[in-house]
Every structure is written in structure tokens, then in C-alpha cells.
Amino acid sequence: MLKSAVRSAFYTELTATEDAYFTPVEQPFRSPSCSISASDVYPAMLRLVALLAALCAVTQGCPTILTKSQWGGRAPTCRTAMATPVTYVVIHHTEGTACSTQSACITQAKNIQNYHINSNGWCDIGYNFLVGEDGNAYEGRGWTSVGAHAPNYNSNSIGISVFGSFMNYNPNTAAQNAVKNLISCGVSRGYIKSAYILKGHRNVTATDCPGNTFYNTVRTWPRFQA
């Protein structure tokens, strides 16, 4: 929808600018005189540049992020604000069932949130975001709330967990791209430092998370530090 709106605005602006340049004068047989000043055209060109930048951001920016209200998550019982931009991004797997459709991922998100609140006694789902093999991201605590996913790092990190257990295989390409795009999105929006440090969960506490195979892949990503 957003892409369509930007394209529509772009072509409307383009048409207006073309008209400004190419509409013939009313009396074509007289000596031509241009009635268009730079002050008429220049603002239109600036708007075109802005629209092109917006279209580029939509095309290359954030993955689809379902807000907590969109996936039907419970409201948190408490919240601690997190100072941004954060230094660390910590990658997890849920060590549960993978999902490749939005409906299946929503079911998993609700199950995990219920477990974290009801069994762990936490305020909310522990992760800042979750990612499915449907290529979507699912908001957990979001960009500006301290998570409960990595001891000693929670207050200065974004925790991203992929639905599934990845000891013996990787998440699919859609999920991996969504994780990478989510990180880039956080950087571009000012929530993650451009010089962030990427870690696997096992780098900050004793665990096999995010699974052996996926961890070996994450190690090859930019800005990884064990």
C-alpha cells in the first residue's frame, strides 16, 4: 500500500513537472516567450527528489513488521524504557516450531508470549522482535523497551529471535533476509548504532542458541564479534 502511494505521488509530480516544461504556449505562432520561472520548476524538482528518496527507502528499507496489536499480543504488565541507539544486536532462535505462514507465526508468537509471562513471570515476551520464515518480523518489546533475552546485555541491545530450532539447518532465505533488513532498519531509524556489534545468544551466556548451523551462518554476517 505504501509503495503504491509513493509511486502514485511520484507519477503525479512527474506529470506536473513535465507539463511545466512541455505545455505549448497559447499563441504558438508569435515569438516564443517562456512564462515559467525557476521558482515554478525548482520546488517541483525538489519534491521529485524527495519522492524518489522515499520510494528508495520503501524498496530497500524495513521488512514488514507486524505490531503487537496486529498479531494479537497481550499488553505488557510493566515496561522499562531503553536508551537508543543501542550497541548490540543479539540473534536467537525460539527453539520451538518454525513457521512459514503469517497465521502460523502469529500462533507461535502468542504461545511464546504466554509462556514468558505465565511461566517465567516476565512483564512481556522477552525478545524485541521475532522473525518467521514467512519473511515477516513480529514486534515483541520493540525498539525502545528493555528486553529479557540476554543477561547483562538487555539494556543495550535489540534481541531478534527466529521462530524454529536451527541446530541442524538454517532458517530459510526469507527469514535471514528479514533479520538483516530489520537490523538495517534499526540503524536507519536511529535505534541501533551504525557501528553496532552483532552477537549470537551463545556469545553472551551459556546456551546453544541460536542453534549450531544458524550460529555458523550468523558468524559470517557483517559486524559479528564473538
Model regions and ranges:
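Glycine-/small-residue-enriched capping loops at alpha/beta junctions
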Residues: 120-123, 133
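Classical eukaryotic N-terminal signal peptides for Sec-dependent ER targeting/secretion
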Residues: 1-4, 30-52
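Intrinsically disordered, low-complexity segments enriched in serine/proline and basic residues
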Residues: 6, 14-16
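Active-site acidic/histidine clusters and adjacent loop/turn architecture
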Residues: 83-117
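Basic/polar, cationic surfaces and motifs that engage anionic cell-wall
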Residues: 46-50, 58-96, 132-226
